[in-house]
């Protein structure tokens, strides 16, 4: 049975979805004022991998991940760029979709935007006021944190020990508007020139935390299975989401809370920051790094563990990914001369590896042990493909397993940069072979070089010429 580490209880628990066969999952998305950095990518890749494993196990996954497109950072960026907040949001949502597509992250079932849910946000805030959990003060609306008796449970903190400014309101005049310094903002009164919407409390905009409470429950219901995000969101963001949502509905907000680990940069394990000059965006990385390598590097570290982003670790991931690609190519190549039938011994070994993969992943998505089973599968594939005689059904079974298991990590064996179809490549290989037999080596070399320019590498083997797409 699949078990997950629940941050709320600080222990592994058997995963039992609310609806059998269905997983309802919300993951906090980016604030869209810039290109996503590798910390954002780590969260997106980790939860995409978790989603893919659920799908591999046969679950239907309703996956919701938001865009925060109303925020102080967007307002600042719009002012710097002499444009509007919606224009900034549109630009970086487009960039987000391009970057996440490049690293093979599946789009969410729904990607809601805060700005498109203002009426629902206002209604949610009004309900909290009516229940006595929120109050208006000079156009702002604040949440009474102490009134929610479970406040601090997720982050394992006592409310008296919590930092002032959980709402990101720390200026003196803002603190003065609160009944209690620990209270946090649900609605912020508009400042001159800022984007705003009319509300019962005057013109303003939503606070950050209320956006996720509204959008998650709108699409997944008052109670859903999994809420995910980075460890940095555990407090105050997720703590505040629970307080808001459960105060309004009187129901458990999310049954399981999953948090991914941090990313450090360089051999010194430095925390990424603009001031240290080590701030790295996916947009820049994939200009020089194979997006599949970045994906594989991040997907094969267990989601709760920290990741050290270094060139050496990227190189190791590239080498391991290459081994998987080679195994797939070796199986594909041998299909052309395979005989009918099944090798029962290999079939048994394959089933053992598939079982080992599932056992590992069922243990809180232990991708390290899971990918170890995949590497063993690649070795088995290579050994079998090197035999003098191979059987078609066994090759297909090995190839299918390799595709399915690596697919959980987001690996694909398609090649986007090779423009020729396989039939056309084979025709050129045949032409090259004819030229070699005619001792026209100049022509044979020219065909090889022309193919290389298009990303197609030829390998001469005892079984004949094979090609691979770089």
Swiss-Prot record:
GO BP annotations, alphabetical order: cysteinyl-tRNA aminoacylation
InterPro entries xref list: Cys-tRNA-ligase (IPR015803), Cys-tRNA-synt_Ia_DALR (IPR015273), Cys-tRNA/MSH_ligase (IPR024909), CysS_C (IPR056411), Rossmann-like_a/b/a_fold (IPR014729), tRNA-synt_1_cat_dom (IPR032678), tRNAsynth_Ia_anticodon-bd (IPR009080)
CDD domains: CysRS_core
EC number: 6.1.1.16
Organism superkingdom: Bacteria
Catalyzed reaction equations: tRNA(Cys) + L-cysteine + ATP = L-cysteinyl-tRNA(Cys) + AMP + diphosphate
Record flagged with keyword Secreted: no
Signal peptide (residue range): none
Pfam family, one: CysS_C
An example Gene Ontology molecular-function term: zinc ion binding
Alphabetized UniProt keyword annotations: Aminoacyl-tRNA synthetase, ATP-binding, Cytoplasm, Ligase, Metal-binding, Nucleotide-binding, Protein biosynthesis, Zinc
Predominant subcellular localization, coarse grouping: cytoplasm
Motif 'KMSKS' region, residue numbers: 271-275
One of the record's GO cellular component terms: cytosol
Cofactor note as given: Binds 1 zinc ion per subunit.
Family note: Belongs to the class-I aminoacyl-tRNA synthetase family.
Designated name of the protein: Cysteine--tRNA ligase
